[in-house]
């Protein structure tokens, strides 16, 4: 497994994992041991007519539980780029983020 050397992972960082099976997962980093990386609420990338989307990785488990992924199954691990991290947060959170600049626009009124 290759770990992006610029990616010092902290608990709750949104990370991307590429598996040897070809699947790409996005989830919240929980912890790492010698054998596994645990991620919470993993989603997988899916292609659609509207572009790339995110869907639940495992449908028959509690998505809030940290899922151990064997390091032997990993190709690489890195922090997720902002636009996909934002999409992940929006899909997994009940909090709706305000658009950028909204606070400044409200202050001006």
What does each model-identified segment do?
Residues 2-109:
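Conserved RNA-binding domains used in RNP assembly and mRNA/RNA metabolism
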């Amino acid at each position: 497994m290759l770990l992006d050397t610029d990616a010092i992972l902290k608990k709750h960082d949104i990370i991307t994992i590429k598996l040897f099976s070809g699947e790409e997962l996005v989830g919240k980093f929980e912890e790492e041991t010698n054998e596994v990386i645990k991620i919470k609420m993993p989603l997988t990338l899916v292609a659609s007519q509207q572009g790339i989307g995110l869907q639940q990785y495992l449908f028959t488990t509690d998505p809030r539980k940290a899922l151990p992924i064997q390091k032997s199954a990993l190709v690489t691990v890195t922090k997720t780029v902002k636009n996909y991290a934002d999409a992940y947060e929006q899909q997994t959170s009940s909090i709706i983020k305000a658009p950028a600049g909204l606070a400044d626009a409200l202050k001006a009124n």
